[in-house]
Structures are given as structure tokens and as C-alpha cells.
Amino acid sequence: MPFLRKIAGTAHTHSRSDSNSSVKFGHQPTSSVASTKSSSKSPRATSRKSIYDDIRSQFPNLTPNSTSSQFYESTPVIEQSFNWTTDDHISAGTLENPTSFTNSSYKNDNGPSSLSDSRKSSGGNSVNSLSFDKLILSWDPTDPDEWTMHRVTSWFKFHDFPESWILFFKKHQLFGHRFIKLLAYDNFAVYEKYLPQTKTASYTRFQQLLKKTMTKNVTNSHIRQKSASKLKSSRSSSESIKSKLKNSKSQEDISNSRSTSESALSPTKSGPSKTDEKNFLHSTSTHQKTKSASSLYRRSFISLRGSSSSNASSAKSPSNIKLSIPARPHSIIESNSTLTKSASPPASPSYPSIFRRHHKSSSSESSLLNSLFGSGIGEEAPTKPNPQGHSLSSENLAKGKSKHYETNVSSPLKQSSLPTSDDKGNLWNKFKRKSQIGVPSPNTVAYVTSQETPSLKSNSSTATLTVQTADVNIPSPSSSPPPIPKTANRSLEVISTEDTPKISSTTASFKETYPDCINPDKTVPVPVNNQKYSVKNFLLDQKFYPLKKTGLNDSENKYILVTKDNVSFVPLNLKSVAKLSSFKESALTKLGINHKNVTFHMTDFDCDIGAAIPDDTLEFLKKSLFLNTSGKIYIKDQMKLQQKPKPAPLTSENNVPLKSVKSKSSMRSGTSSLIASTDDVSIVTSSSDITSFDEHASGSGRRYPQTPSYYYDRVSNTNPTEELNYWNIKEVLSHEENAPKMVFKTSPKLELNLPDKGSKLNIPTPITENESKSSFQVLRKDEGTEIDFNHRRESPYTKPELAPKREAPKPPANTSPQRTLSTSKQNKPIRLVRASTKISRSKRSKPLPPQLLSSPIEASSSSPDSLTSSYTPASTHVLIPQPYKGANDVMRRLKTDQDSTSTSPSLKMKQKVNRSNSTVSTSNSIFYSPSPLLKRGNSKRVVSSTSAADIFEENDITFADAPPMFDSDDSDDDSSSSDDIIWSKKKTAPETNNENKKDEKSDNSSTHSDEIFYDSQTQDKMERKMTFRPSPEVVYQNLEKFFPRANLDKPITEGIASPTSPKSLDSLLSPKNVASSRTEPSTPSRPVPPDSSYEFIQDGLNGKNKPLNQAKTPKRTKTIRTIAHEASLARKNSVKLKRQNTKMWGTRMVEVTENHMVSINKAKNSKGEYKEFAWMKGEMIGKGSFGAVYLCLNVTTGEMMAVKQVEVPKYSSQNEAILSTVEALRSEVSTLKDLDHLNIVQYLGFENKNNIYSLFLEYVAGGSVGSLIRMYGRFDEPLIKHLTTQVLKGLAYLHSKGILHRDMKADNLLLDQDGICKISDFGISRKSKDIYSNSDMTMRGTVFWMAPEMVDTKQGYSAKVDIWSLGCIVLEMFAGKRPWSNLEVVAAMFKIGKSKSAPPIPEDTLPLISQIGRNFLDACFEINPEKRPTANELLSHPFSEVNETFNFKSTRLAKFIKSNDKLNSSKLRITSQENKTE
């Protein structure tokens, strides 16, 4: 059925002369009362001529040019335009001149010519004269429930979509919510392959047209609003016209004529003279406040929406047309005076004055009513009052006196008034002609058995449509049944039906459907129950009844029932509780609830709970022992909200496979869960909310945000029938929060397979699966495995093939236990080295150092099956690389090394390891390990050799015990010299690039992929927590995790330093120091002798060993690890709450990469500022409005930063999107360059290099307030006050600088562990000279947090939009969910912009907000921005006053964040230690 059928392809162009009627169309031809198909036996042409003659008789001043033939010739066009069967009223205002259509219709004498002229005035050569740009729908296209299947197909036809699309949407019932959800491509992609893609049928066109339909209808809706306000005046003017016509015409003709007001506004069919036309238009001057004919047309049409009838009633039917319609039998309600007129019913197919007009101009029900019953409802009052006091007369209905008979607004039908004596026959004819087919007897009627109004005895509220054939009962939940009259001695039993789609007007159909409701032959008496019952008939023997206990207390106990699920009820004795607090505690104890975040509600069996009971009301009920109540109390656990049943999978009727774009099951594996994009995080608050409908809840209007994909692994042990949403997550988190603890698998003692004295070569035995469960454990001295270092062991290199290829190092000169490492390598590619170890252990003379007792044991030993890696590629898309899979870097090198060594038939090994008082991980002999060359006393690292071409990467270690290495260092940063000299070794660059690419693209898909297997319990606990940005301390301790592509032990030169001193050499060889590096491929590494002076210094440029006196002057060098550790110590020693970050504006920036040696220039200018900064990029920690955000280390100062980068392709000058992104980044830089405030994320510097724009930001640990809300739940009011005050201070500072943020939301507020809240993400901020002036700006930001003036782009806006957004944030913190959580994006946008309404406060949240908090929200949600307070004014609001005793670190939220940070750190350590086999 056409939505708004184009008049094209039929050789008839829609004529402007009948445009007033062409936009009114009837309803379903099989059921509508005002059907377009008349059952009259007379020819249609004759009927039209007769109608036209009657019109001429009533209007004698018609122009002579308007002939009967002309009207007859134009009628087919009218009929065609009327032959539409949609139930929608559509007005199209395209009229250009108010007189052009009248004059053109009567321009010539011949009909076709006038019709042609009329076409020309209809818009020239336009195919569709009804302009889509000015289309107005009487129903709301933004409401998914309004999109019925009929409207969907009509919309497709109107926009020329192919029939295959229409059939597919019909076949799979894609309407309502399912139709609107197709706006999102993820939902549309499921069906796209089944729909043919053409120029006129594509997703892009479908989305644009659907959005345009929604937008245009709201944009033009102001016309409907204006017409609604003028409805009363227009009706009065039409009444005056009728009164004039009544004086000149007979009562019979007037009763049969169509609405005079419509004739006055649509004079083109009868063609009156200009004088009459002016008179008619003058009577409707209330609609003509503008000179625009288009506005006149639309307003007239809307105000007279009900005045149009079906196409058969486009002209009046005179009384001289005789139709053979049988006389209607006399109803016993009628008086004798009414029989005479009803014996000869009028012949008009529709009567315009029977039914009451619906007063809502924009209601979809009014258009539906007009389609069913014609127009002019309630226009004429009956000539004399109805004698029945309780009858449904149109007068009573119009005055609103019979409210009990009003139907529900959702009902598809509207009741008519009881016909008067003049109208009964006419109404009977309507019903008869519509139901002539299959009617056995047209004379069958139903007798109403009471002289009063029929009483309704059904339990449900019903509304009765009283007609002469039957009583049609329509359920009306909003209305109550009328009282039963006391004088009524008989009643008609009514059976209410639900959702009756059509009126079956025949008595036969009523008999078949409701055999007990309609009886034309006899009356139905009121059932009288004469049977008498006695109480004794129901009494049982006394022994079956319960016996009351006899106790010491004579007073009776009073019990109520409490429940937490409305299923299981527990009795609670009110006598045992005296105070309200004890009552609550007893109730919570009975139900097993261990917190007080609950609300109390009244309930009963098979009932829904009532509203939350305030404390004062609950106190009153307790004192009154819950009298006049059900005695049942429902306690709603706010920490564990009711969970919805999981909806059935979305399937179509013909089982079309609906594949999800992102497979949720693929997230179950430990590897692929890391690769999931964090774009899902934005689903909660961002533009993809179009797809966030609950399919099964669309009827009730409940909609929640879609759960991000990475949450699906969180509750893998929950009931599979439950839906995964935020409440599931919060439920699990609440239990963990109540008892925060970390449970790790304990690890057995690290066993060292020590060699026998007589063995030549001993290979360490891998630790088994049961032994590899690592955790914190202190290694104690094992008496049976002690090594006697007084007896030298035999060298494993006595075999010829294992003979050393270079000179052995000198033996240690002192007796202190030192560990040195000797690695050997044959550089020929054929003779490769097989890694093997032989372990010796020093004799201990004292217990382990204290730091080892608290530090984790690094157990990185592995079996061949435990192919694990310390870092998972492609894990940079999450806030923290999670989970940090793997344990041994030896495994990570397996694939690359085997590629280069698989052709070698013989593997050779040469390695020597001396052990001191430290625990050392052993390496399995069949794997190759990297080549660290220098190991120091306290490090716990894997030590082995590998090929020269191998690429060095750090092992999975923690530096928790690293600080003692700097105890001997000077306090000055520049004083550290040779103690940090590292013998470096270059790696092969091409192989590095290839391996990096392989790691990034392989996704662990090869046979030796890096995987780690956790048991489900451990994995769930770890992944659930790893969602916040770690603190800088955690990053400093785990640099290799967050900077996986950096060489942390690469020496960085700081400049010329003094010659090496013995003291620095001692510190270099001190067991407290930890460092490792790599050497040149052509340079064999050489251990450092453990004495105070050594003989050689390595020169990495020429690869030769030079004596000390011939070496170049040594330079001060530090490793990145050293610099970071110094910064970590300085941070710990800092006592300032606000730690200052070094700003780098206007300073040269140098990025540290692994491809070249970087020299740190610490020279300062006259202002004491560094002239140059070196920085290093790490893992991705988030995505902002533009580009990605990475972790960043300021190598010059050691500070942790964040860098936002936008990469611009080389040839992107024509790409507007990229240009706008770069421009936004430049704007962000210029706007925020000079900002410095505690509650604003600092911007530290900017760099543009190699088409990459880098913006350096302050690093804020913790997480956003939005993510905390989603994981933790709603906040307490003192905490909300604490955060709101900080945000207000930041906003006041921004506004004082003339900056509008324009995208304030909880996700853009960062909260660290110290409770400091910072405003971030200024990607769309704007700098303005006058921030409080309503300047014309574009709509930016996220819809749900937008102020009304931002959505209404015609109205400018100011900095007050940030105040509105702040109110949304406060509401979000109170409610635990985003504002407008029950609406999707499009609906919320129109709700804000059109209705100018603030987001509603959820019912369960309202009791939790104090009166001061409500006042604060009301101030923020002031619709008029002029009256909305500024940030400084809100700082003086009582809500902004934070209690002095408030301590953020003592709140549960702070403990929650801290436990997450500890768990993150522990997770990093565990993954470095844990080796599990499959």
C-alpha cells in the first residue's frame, strides 16, 4: 500500500484542484466503514452528475465555465488519488498561489484543457506534486512502535524501492523496532546479502531517506502545533458558516451535505464564483496569518483533518437519489417520533456529523478514526436532546462528560456517539454496505435490553461502541467501567476482546464470535444466584487446623512477610524489633543481604512491587504494625538488580541465518580476547545506541545499552539463560568488592637439578606441570643440595666439539660471591649453538636479603609443551596489555630461531654459569634464548646464549627488588657515569622489522603461537579487573610490558663525563645492580673482571678491544630502565599532592627508537628549561576523539606521559575527513597550550614529524568516571559532591579562559587513585571571546549529554551547555547509568530538541537523591540558558560544599580502584612467572 503514492506513470498528474482531498485517504477496504468502494447499484458517472447538479443547486453562483462534463472528466483523477488504502494522514504543503488552482480549473470550457492547466499549476513538470521536503506525518516516525508493517511497505513504495525489498521485509516481518534498528549498518548487514543492491535500493539510500523522514517530520511539526492552537477558532468559524447555510437550505439537504468548512476551503470541485470564494476564504481567516499559500494550505488541512471523508463522499449526495436499502427495524431505545425519519434513510455513503472529533491535531488516532468513519465528527449537535440520560450522545462525548466510555489511546478504534433520530438510518447504511457480502439477513439487529445505559460486568475495563447492529467492546485500560444504574433490572453481559483489529459489523459475524453477547430475539437477564450457602459446609474437622503455640508471653506476635525476589517469602516478627534500624537489619539478615544499599516496596502475591517507601513512611507502617497493607514487603537489592531472561536468538520466520558481525564466542579464548577492539567501550555512551534495543522488551519500552564484547568473558560461569548486561557484571563485582582479595596458585620450591661431580654434561630437567604453579614463596636452604665451591667442577667443554673459541676470562680475584656470565658464539652460519646450562650454586653464609622475601620468585623454567610468551601481539587495543601471557622469552624466540637454524645438522653449545645468592631460572635445552651479556648480583634473569643474528628482547621480570642497585649512586642525576656503562650489541634491522610485522599480523595463528591457558576461575578474575590505567609505579616496575618494542637496556649517552673512577667500577660490579644489553654481531662479548680495575673497554664501533689508556674518553650513559627507576624513586619521595609535569612547548623533540643510538642533551637555557627532550612511545591506552593515545616516557626526565597521535597520509590533501581531524588537533593544541589547572589534563607539548602529529598529555592513572560507573555502580552522594566540586572548578577555569568544552560526559572525566578528577578530551572544544553569548555554533558532542540549545541548531548556545552536561553527569553518577537510558540516539535527540525536556530521574534513583541534590539538578537542567547558573555560581551552591571529614581514600570506590591497581601489578608478575602446560 502506498505511503504517499506518486502520481506518475498513469497519464494523470495530480491536480492541484483536488489536492485538498487527495491527501485524505481511506482505510482497509474490507473493514472500513467509510470504504472507497460503494455498494450502490447506480452507475458512478450518473451519481457524480447528480451530485454535481445538487452542488450547483446549492451554489447558484458558479461560473458558467465550470460544466458538468468538466467535473466528470476530472473525477477519475480524483478517484485515482483517493484510491489509496493507507491509514495515515499526510499533508503536503506545496501550494504556490492560493488562487491559481481555482482559476486554472475553470480557465476553458472543455474539461481536459482545464485539467491540463490544473496540472501545470500543480508544480510544473514535477512528477510528484506532493513535496517530500514539506511532508508532514500525523504519526511520530521517531517512535518505533508507530512503524507498522503497512507503513513500512508504504514508505518503500513511496521512495521507489524495488518490490523484492518490500517482499523481503514482509516475509521477515521487519517493522517496528526491528525496522528502526536497521539504521545501524551492523544490523542491516545481516540482511544485506538477501537484498538486491541497485542505484535506487542500497543501504546508503535507505539510511538517508529514513533519517530524512524522521528529521523532516519533526522540522515541519511546528505547523501542526500552530494549527492545533487554532483548531477552536476554525471550528467556530465553520459553525457560523453552517448556521448561515441552515437558514437558506432545507434541514434535509444540510444534514446530508459534506462539511461546509471543507467546502469553503476546497472550492475547486464545485467551482464557485470569486465572490463566494472570497466569502468562504474570509470565514476561515483565522488560518491566514501568512501570505504563503503553502502555509495556508497546510494549516487549513491540518485544522480540518477530520473534515474529509472517503473518496465517494467528495461531493454531496442530494436527497433525490433513491437507494434500495431495507428499512432498519425499530430499536426499543428509540422513541416513536424517530421511526418516521429513519424509515427512509439518506442515501449518502458517509455521514459527516455522527462521530465525535478527536481534539488532538497531531494524534495518530484521529487520522485512523477519520479513515474509518469519515469526517466532521461532532460538528453538528443533534436537533433535539437525546431522551436517554446515560446514552453516548455526541454532545456528551464532545463535552467530555462520558469519560467512562473513552477508549485507550493505543486502541486502533474510536467509539462513535449514539446516533440521533436523524442519523440512525445513515449509519445503518454504512455498516450494511461495508458488510453486504456474507450477510444472511440485513434486518437482524441487537436489542439493548435496558432503558438505561448497558452496564459492563466484565472485570476488565471496557469501552462500548454503541451502534444499531451490535455492541463492540474494546479494552480500555485507562478507563473504568461505568457504575451499574440502580434502576436497571437487566444487564447485557459483555465479553471484552483484546486488540480487535477490525469492526465486524454484521450480526452473523458477531453471533459466530460472541454467541452470548448478541441475541436479537430475547433479552439476557441478570444472573440471579438464589442458592444459599452455609459456613458449616466448608468447615473441616478440628484436627486438621493448626494449633497456636502457648508461650510465656501473653501478647500475640505480629508477623509480616519479607522477600527479595517476590517468590520466596520469609516471616519477620515485628514484636522483636523496636526501631526502624533494627527492623531493617532484621529484614536484611533474614534475606541474607549483607549491605544496606536497598529499598523497601510493598508487594503481594501475583503483583508488581510499588514505589520505594521512604524511611518516614516505613517508620509509620512499622508503628501501625502494617495495618491496611498486604503485610508483604519487597526488599530491592540495589547492588543486584533484577536480571532479565535472556531473549531468544533473533531469527526470521524462514530461518534466515542472522550472523553477528562480531562473533561473541570468539572472545572465549585467551588469545583472541586480547585482540578485541576497545571500540566496544564506546557502545555504552556513543552513537551505536541505535542498535541497543532489547528485542523482547520493545513492547514495554525497556532498552539498555548493548554489552561491550569484551565483557562477555566476565561472567562465563553464570546461567546461560541469562542475558549478559551491565547488571550481571555489577553483580559479580559487588561480591568481589565486599571481600577484596587475591587468590593465586601457590608455587612449589624452585628445584635446581644440580650436576653430579662425575658428569660431563648435565641438562636441567624441566619443571613439571604440578611444580610450575608459581606464586610467592621463599626458598630455603636445602642441606642435601649444597655446593662446595672449594672443589672446582669439571668443565663441560672438555669435548673437542665444545672447545672454547676464545680466551677464557680471568678468575675472580676476591672471595665475594659474584655471578659472571661467559657467552660464546661461532659467527659462521653453519655452526650454530645449542643452548644448554650447567648450574653451580654458591655457598651461602647468611639468609636471603629482606627484599627477596617480599618479591616474587621468577620461575621461568619451561617444558616443551609450555609455549608461552611474555607479551601478546596486537594487544595494544586495550587499556593495559591483558592478559600478559607467557612466562619465558626463550619460547618467544622459538619460531624465528628455528627458521634460521632448521638446516643445521649439528648443534653446539658453550655456556658457563656461576650462581650466587640469587634464584635463577633454568632454560630447557632444546630452545634458544636471547643473549644478555652482563648479569649482576641481584637480578633473577634467564641467562643463556644464542645466535649472533638473534634479536634481543627482555625477559618477563619485575624490578620490585631493583632499587638497592642505586644506593651507591650520587644524588645528582649527572653524577652517574661508568656504573651504567653497557656493552651494547646491534641487532639485524631487517629481521627486527620482519619479526615486528609478523607479531602484529599473525594474531598467534601459527603452529607455535604464543598462548597461555588459565583455568576459568583465574582468567575471569584477572580479566574482570584489568580495565584501568595502571599507576606510574606499576608501569615503572613493568617497563617491558608497556614498552614491548623498546630496548630498555640500550645505553643512552648523556655527554662527556669524567674518567671512570674505581668507585664507579665497584658500583658497576656490585651485586645490587641490574643491567643487560646486547653486543655487536661481529664482536664477541667479554665479561667484566670483578676487580676494581679492568683491562679492556669495549668499543662498539670497530669491534676491537683496546687497552684502557688507548680507549676514548668514556661518556656518561644510562639505560632507559635506569632513568625510569630514578624517576620512580623521585616520584615516591615527592610529598606534593600535585606533581608538576615538565612542559615541552617550543622545545625540540627526539623520539627514542631501537634503530639508532640516542644522545640525551640535558643542556638548559637561561630560564632553566631543557633545550631538547627525548621520548619513547609505548602501548596504546585508549582512543580519543581524534587519533589514538599511547603511553609515553619522557627519557630526559623519566616522567610518564601520554601522547595522542594522528597519522596523516602523504597524499591526503584532498581527504576532507583527515583535514578536519588535523585541523581539530591544531585547534586543540592552540586552545589548551597555556592551560594549567589541577582539574584539567595538562597539555605538555606538540610535535609534527613524518606526517604524524603528536600531542603530549599528562598521564592520569586510574580510569574514567564513566568506566567506574559501569563497573562499580552508582556513587554515594558525598563522593558525588567531592567529584562535582572538582569538575566545577575545572569548568570555571576553562570558562574564565574563554573555552567551551562542548563534550562533557562521564567518560571524559578521569579519576586517579588520589581522588583527583580531571577533565579531558578537548577534541571538540571551542575558544570564544564571549563564552556566555548565544553564538551560532554547530551541534557537537554526544547526544545524551547535550543541552536543548545544542540540538536546536537554529538557536545559538554558550558555555551554559557545559552546565547542562554537568547535570547529566551528576545524574549519571546517582543513577549508575547514562541519561536517557531508555531511549536510543535518534529518539533522545528529538526528545531534547523538540520537547525541551531534561533527562528523567529513574524511579529507583529518586529516593537516593537528597533535596539539595535535586535542587542542584534542577538548576543545571534549567531550559532557558539565560537562567541557568554559571560554574562559579554553582560552586556556591550547598551541594558543592564538601564535608571536611570526607576522605576519598577511605571510600569503597578508592579501595576498588586500588585493588584493581594491585591486581594489575600482581597479574603482570604472575604472568611473568607462571608456566602452565596445556
Curated annotation (Swiss-Prot):
EC number from the UniProt entry: 2.7.11.1
Membrane-spanning intervals of the chain: none
GO-annotated molecular function: ATP binding; MAP kinase kinase kinase activity; protein kinase activity; protein serine kinase activity; protein tyrosine kinase activity
Catalytic activity: L-seryl-[protein] + ATP = O-phospho-L-seryl-[protein] + ADP + H(+); L-threonyl-[protein] + ATP = O-phospho-L-threonyl-[protein] + ADP + H(+)
Sequence ranges of Acidic residues compositional bias: 967-977
Chain positions covered by the region annotation Disordered: 1-70, 99-126, 217-359, 373-427, 644-671, 752-877, 895-939, 960-1021, 1053-1116
The protein's name: Serine/threonine-protein kinase BCK1/SLK1/SSP31
